[in-house]
Amino acid sequence: MDKEKDHEVEWLEAQKIEISVDLLAAAKQHLLFLETVDRNRWLYDGPALEKAIYRYNACWLPLLVKYSESSSVSEGSLVPPLDCEWIWHCHRLNPVRYNSDCEQFYGRVLDNSGVLSSVDGNCKLKTEDLWKRLYPDEPYELDLDNIDLEDISEKSSALEKCTKYDLVSAVKRQSPFYYQVSRSHVNSDIFLQEAVARYKGFLYLIKMNRERSLKRFCVPTYDVDLIWHTHQLHPVSYCDDMVKLIGKVLEHDDTDSDRGKGKKLDTGFSKTTAQWEETFGTRYWKAGAMHRGKTPVPVTNSPYASDVLVKDPTAKDDFQNLIQFPEVEVVEVLLEIIGVRNLPDGHKGKVSVMFSKTQPDSLFNAERRLTILSEVGEKQVATFQCEPTGELVFKLISCSPSKIPVSREPKNLGFASLSLKEFLFPVITQLSVEKWLELTPSKGSQTDTKPISLRVAVSFTPPVRSPSVLHMVQSRPSCKGSCFFPIIGKSRLAKSSTHIVDETQTEVITLQIRNSADGGILKDDQRQVMGVTDSGETRVLAVYTGSFWSLLDSKWSLKQINASTADNPLFEILGPRVVKIFSGRKLDYEPKHCANLRSDLDFMTLVEFSKQHPYGKTVGLVDMRFGSIEAKENWLLLPGIVSAFILHTVLKKGGSEGFNVTTKDIKEESKQTKLVAATENNVNANSTNVETQTAITAPKKGSGCGGGCSGECGNMVKAANASGCGSSCSGECGDMVKSAANASGCGSGCSGECGNMVKAANASGGGYGARCKAAKASGCGGGCGGGCGGGCGDMVKSVNASGCGGGCNGECGNMVKAA
């Protein structure tokens, strides 16, 4: 108890650190600026970047000097051009170098006081007028059509005051940062408030190290790093605050990028984690603050032309309420079991914790296992997504040692629960908790001793809307070769129906293709997609016009794009918005650490292009193999499911009805661009720059839920170096695959028919295909999807792992062990 009080005292001392900037408000401004820059990616590289650096040195900094020196100039606020503000931003993120450059050329540090950001909609007229007077030959806004690199080089070498700091490299180091902090939860007040408090804790560790003459490289998580960057963007305040705290300007070293095991970043993060937890008694790793992995490959390098005509979004939509779909919220959870106390005297078994939810939901309905830090001496965390409802239940189990090679039933020592609602409703009071939970003894356990307690650490992200997932289920019983439905000819297709169901197996609508062969009023070669609601209402949802499909009474259209390369979109959905359909998993759906679990050829990504998102934003994913669509926004649900239905039908059929591309064509194109990525055996750790080496392990013998099995498993996967889902299955598995050494994913050794495969109604997470109930599901890809919030549900053991990050986020729902 005294130690807990010491931890509390240390934390309170850290919170006394004085910061002369409103970091919460400044962080929101910072995020808005990064978002704006990301919409103008010409600032990241190329001639425009070179010109921006020249303008920064030749125009902006001298203007800033005049503004601070002259009373006539300093009336009102300055608003820098976007390109100059971006270079200034990157220069300030090396505070020691920025200060020395300013002192060398201008005799003092140039501050941002009196300067407003170009992205706030602030009036630029006064600054533009001043700019024109000082630089009549240089327009205020960068002219992208008039850039001469030779001229820039000559002018730059002629500048008397120009930093020698490599600003091109600085920009390239900072460009990927926005991806790490771009998710919506980062901009919430509660997340940023806790980030500011954690930043003070981070500074407190640095102060302690200096006082003890300890040379430690402290590495921040991304929430802390965001606030640290924000502080540095106020150069004078940052300088004064740091000198007051540690006697010097704290350097921000972003030049290290080697995330290899044992390298500076890896060891730095491990030591920072250990020092934080020893000093404050709380966990350093935090949900939503870890490294997300590498920035996804863009789908285009050319910004969207916003002059493309789209249909009036305000026009009356008679189909708006045709389907009813409940909105579901989701939180990301990071869980660690810290310790156990009051175990019975003489207890000799190995203890671990099984965790689940009292109210299993569409995102998390499995039971998973975690080791206990105090018992095994190495860190293991679980990160997963779930609905912010119900309670997390923790069951302490004990496995007794035995010399007999017969598995014994683990002994249940008791259980405890933690309410999610307590922290998230009606208002979010905190995003992390670490506490002792007293266990309720199981039946038959001793009750005359002190109650056993578990110390549990949980952190959450603020709730956000969960993507909606709809599945297409063929009314015919045949399921050979595909869990979706076989396309076996026009006449039979026209008479069959496809039921659209949600995650709870509730039918949303039924779709059917009607063609001229069925008789009636349709003209030759005309096709219609009919929809029947649960109330019995029948509507025409799509009509094939001869060259494209007209959807929802011409409000939307679906047509094929003549793609010149495999990287280009294959189809386009046009309406009030512009959506392009790409083969494979792109952007946010890009596979990270489970690439071999499912082939990219099974998927199509829906990407919206707009003025707000000129390089595209993912809005949905179609699983062509198992017949499902994930929609991130409600407006996509109906046009998306109708389009997915048409695409699957036409592509499987061999290409017709306006589309001359087939699934075979897509596969051939995809091979050219290597759409199937190799499985990465790295768990991206921490924060700014850390990624750790991992080893995915499987048990030598199938032993219930050991090694990453969630749900009810029969024979477990036997694989020396199984990757992907080799050692992990969620749901109810019958005879599981015994795969050979180096088996990749769940597919190896599972050719076509897998015995009793996953009962998909119970699968959770992002394994999109694992939703159809099939006695003989084709392949294994969709059969291993559940677990903790994503494609794989793997358990990952990592020696000396320095964090959780990208390997535990979204796609994989991994468990991570770290020494």
UniProtKB/Swiss-Prot annotation:
A family per Pfam: GRDP-like
The protein's name: Glycine-rich domain-containing protein 1
Cellular component GO terms, alphabetical: plasma membrane
Gene: GRDP1
Disrupted-gene phenotype: Increased sensitivity to salt and osmotic stress in germination and cotyledon development. Abscisic acid hypersensitivity.
BP GO annotations: abscisic acid-activated signaling pathway; cellular response to osmotic stress; regulation of abscisic acid-activated signaling pathway
Described purpose of this protein according to its UniProt entry: Plays a regulatory role in abscisic acid (ABA) signaling and tolerance to abiotic stress during germination. May be involved in the regulation of the ABI transcriptional factors.
Organism this protein belongs to: Arabidopsis thaliana
Induction of synthesis: Up-regulated upon salt, osmotic, glucose or exogenous abscisic acid treatment.
Entry keyword set: Abscisic acid signaling pathway, Stress response
